[in-house]
UniProtKB/Swiss-Prot annotation:
Proregion residues excised on maturation: 18-22
Entry keyword set: Extracellular matrix, Glycoprotein, Repeat, Secreted, Signal, Transport, Vitamin A
Protein name: Retinol-binding protein 3
Signal peptide: 1-17
Annotated stretches, region: Disordered: 389-415, 1227-1286
CDD domains associated with the record: Peptidase_S41_IRBP
SMART domains: TSPc
Positions annotated with a glycan in the UniProt record: N107, N161, N205, N513, N1114
4 X approximate tandem repeats as annotated region, ranges: 23-1231
Mapped Sequence repeat ranges: 23-323, 324-631, 632-932, 933-1231
Amino acid sequence: MVRKWALLLPMLLCGLTGPAHLFQPSLVLEMAQVLLDNYCFPENLMGMQGAIEQAIKSQEILSISDPQTLAHVLTAGVQSSLNDPRLVISYEPSTLEAPPRAPAVTNLTLEEIIAGLQDGLRHEILEGNVGYLRVDDIPGQEVMSKLRSFLVANVWRKLVNTSALVLDLRHCTGGHVSGIPYVISYLHPGSTVSHVDTVYDRPSNTTTEIWTLPEALGEKYSADKDVVVLTSSRTGGVAEDIAYILKQMRRAIVVGERTVGGALNLQKLRVGQSDFFLTVPVSRSLGPLGEGSQTWEGSGVLPCVGTPAEQALEKALAVLMLRRALPGVIQRLQEALREYYTLVDRVPALLSHLAAMDLSSVVSEDDLVTKLNAGLQAVSEDPRLQVQVVRPKEASSGPEEEAEEPPEAVPEVPEDEAVRRALVDSVFQVSVLPGNVGYLRFDSFADASVLEVLGPYILHQVWEPLQDTEHLIMDLRQNPGGPSSAVPLLLSYFQSPDASPVRLFSTYDRRTNITREHFSQTELLGRPYGTQRGVYLLTSHRTATAAEELAFLMQSLGWATLVGEITAGSLLHTHTVSLLETPEGGLALTVPVLTFIDNHGECWLGGGVVPDAIVLAEEALDRAQEVLEFHRSLGELVEGTGRLLEAHYARPEVVGQMGALLRAKLAQGAYRTAVDLESLASQLTADLQEMSGDHRLLVFHSPGEMVAEEAPPPPPVVPSPEELSYLIEALFKTEVLPGQLGYLRFDAMAELETVKAVGPQLVQLVWQKLVDTAALVVDLRYNPGSYSTAVPLLCSYFFEAEPRRHLYSVFDRATSRVTEVWTLPHVTGQRYGSHKDLYVLVSHTSGSAAEAFAHTMQDLQRATIIGEPTAGGALSVGIYQVGSSALYASMPTQMAMSASTGEAWDLAGVEPDITVPMSVALSTARDIVTLRAKVPTVLQTAGKLVADNYASPELGVKMAAELSGLQSRYARVTSEAALAELLQADLQVLSGDPHLKTAHIPEDAKDRIPGIVPMQIPSPEVFEDLIKFSFHTNVLEGNVGYLRFDMFGDCELLTQVSELLVEHVWKKIVHTDALIVDMRFNIGGPTSSISALCSYFFDEGPPILLDKIYNRPNNSVSELWTLSQLEGERYGSKKSMVILTSTLTAGAAEEFTYIMKRLGRALVIGEVTSGGCQPPQTYHVDDTDLYLTIPTARSVGAADGSSWEGVGVVPDVAVPAEAALTRAQEMLQHTPLRARRSPRLHGRRKGHHRQSQGRAGSLGRNQGVVRPEVLTEAPSGQKRGLLQCG
């Protein structure tokens, strides 16, 4: 930019130093200052100041004496430098003063404002109830605020009820930015306020956002009505912005010419006191709809429909007429699909698509056709279903017109026999080609009734001359088709002569809703040609309708080979429905009403029939004769392939079945579609792989001579020491990674004799670097395999010399013997051993011998396999020639079997223990090495945490000791998640406690660690709604209270809202005569609030001991006592109480139930509870992502040592959980609800010598026997909130 100014400003300066001496250098600065102060792209002016100073100092002189010429030169320079054609410098010596400004609106009367506005405003109602509004100047906010009521009453109300609106801006060259919201708001759908533009004003250096008005006086234009904006090449400024905004909002269709591409505010400013003026855009749009995208300024608004401005209104009315018809078009289209479309199962999806289709962008018939066809064919996947534009002569007269049958009647057959013979001769061309090949050509299809009449003549003149031919070529290249009624009859002549009726195809006709099966006819004039002789159909792009049907069905049935061009794809059995009729034509739907379904269940959806051999039509006959010659050897090739499989394939158990299937497919004509060795090889490969499930079976065509398979391999060549050193460096990569982790990569498997020959050098140059590492990574990701004879030697290095290990077994098809492969007793160099970790990296590229090594190491659990599933190669592959042809079969000749299971290795290859992309396999292996190094420490830490914190100290110490002895079980752990799963299983087996858990929680999930992350405490205001939602209360029949809550809260948390609990929960049930507490869905929680909850169900007086809790971490026993003071009124001990339980009842809910049952205060009805535990604690294990959840406390209140942990609370009345509430209500209704105070409670109060342990009476009132171990002294209570702690 600096360089541009440096070139431009010398021109300015030099031009101002002409002989007239009227121009001073200061004028350059003034002109530049006008730009700096007013140009709306100030960022484009960076560097101008320095360029000006440099230009002023320049002594170059450009002698332009004419100021008009100078103005033109300066304009071209400025526009070129700033790339803005709106910048214009003009010389106007006659303009002595600035043009007078229009009087301010505030100084005009209302009548003057209205008169001025009416000059540029016209409105009328056009034909078809289309509103027309022409605006030649956009008034500003001051005018609109004064005249809005007038405009609404006299203009808008006449237009708002029209069915569509045309807004004519063709003559609008400007206006006020402040008027934009008024225009947009009345056309903007909805009641929301929208940001439609942002305007930057350079003189004030301010940015103003333009929003639609929050309230519009009068009614807005309905969103479902179309709006069209007319534009011309003169439309400029604010009018362009309005057109662009409405187009971007998809609220209007712009019709006409591209607009001028002006500016929102273009001003002509005098340069200093000179006669030069600079026209400059002082404000700009920063992006319609606030998106900041490229706007219309400088380029103009591109119309949706381009047309000359003078024709824009006419074109707009045509667009509106089309859009008014759209709902009817869619409705007629949906009706036609429901009534006629043959693929009924696809109709609902089509109807749904049409109902949801967005047609807002449709402005022409071509647009509509394109959009409808794209949608219909994408959803239906049926190319036959399409909408077309039709001209008047093509337009359908109605839904009755269809292409299903020709309108003309069946022609009458002449009675004269000579004429009939001549007619047959004219239609059919018959000859016998060399090689006894029949040739039959006919160029049209007749109706079945015509063929029936002419049958004897056709038999004698056409069919009998072809009966004794060896093959038949049927020429349909010039056949445009005709009625399809004769197709089943023609097909019948190609069935086997002695066969019963054959199902040829079926058809479904939507009009009759009938599926019809078509069978071959057995009673024919003459003998069928049969299926054993070759039939070849010649086709071209002119082959159509019934001729296409015949070609398709002959190919589908496997009775013919097609040669030639793809057929026309012109089908019968369609129906034409008129969707729209206009004077220029209209739209019509072509809908298929009948579907062909072949014997494979495939529907033919039209389109051309693709030949088996595609050639030009004029070459089809020659090509068919070539294919015929190839097919003479087809049987021998297929059967020869089967014989090779029987002799050499390594899986004899499937060979017999594969041979039978090949012969069956050959007899069925399945290989008639093969037209050369290449296509036959492809088809045989696909069939063999599908039959066997073995992707290693290949048949291929090789025109060149292949090396004989039996040729003995050359003896291994032992390289020189120099060559060997170079080869080892190139083929082997070794490295010792941090942590004494060895890394070995080699990308090929050498033959055993070669390995033995260079063994000492390999040991010295490769193996010695790795043998003393702590663990080893063997990288086979890039190893395609090759020789497998060296695999046992490689495996032997990773096992001890004795005892020898059985690696795998090999079944050899040639000898039918199974050979066991074992480790070698002696190897060169030191063994790696069997105790150090081994990791094998594999990928999709790893094959044959590399897979054998990975399979063996995985099968014997000697290595961890990491990477991608391997290729699934073979130990040995044989390639055999099929007869003397250029066809070859490649197949595995040996099969490897697992040493541990005796089963053959999976044909799909090696499935890794850890499946990851090959690119991260090495880093995954290193992570596992690091993890396994941590395992001893992790087990030690876990044992110590259990010993120090488990609720049963003796069992915790025992578990820690036994856990250390299980370290070998963790030798093959591959992830922290697997380690957590294994550790949890061991701990639960050792303890018998399912609540002792291990979790793997990654760093990004730390917020879900139980007991580690504190729960956020909501505000008391939020708590009120939370309480209403969490607690369910009711008063049942007989004044029986009902209370359900599904989780216990923390004591400290509930203390803050005790008054809310009393107000919204407790007061609703405290005055009932009996209470049902529903714990069936309560999953527990903190136990700190149990003392307070229990206290409400005992009378005020000396505290009662509820339970004793042993806490292992601090090795202490705490006592739970009732509280002496509570928030709200007590329920007391005299009223009946029932607790409902289920197998879901857990944790704190079990503790509460256990206490109330043991003290005889409540009757428990339902199911045995889950047998949970006191709230456990979670501990982090070292620097891993493992967390141990350990039950650290247990109830020890019972004298006999029993508790509910692990076994659950047994109900007094056992019933299914869903029946518990009903049973409780029944028992409460048949029992007196008041009872005298139980003597047991008197005996359990503070200060009594005898204390009682009671049992629940029939309804949970205290009835007791003496139990001296329960009552002890309690500390004096203090006032607590509801559900507060002691």
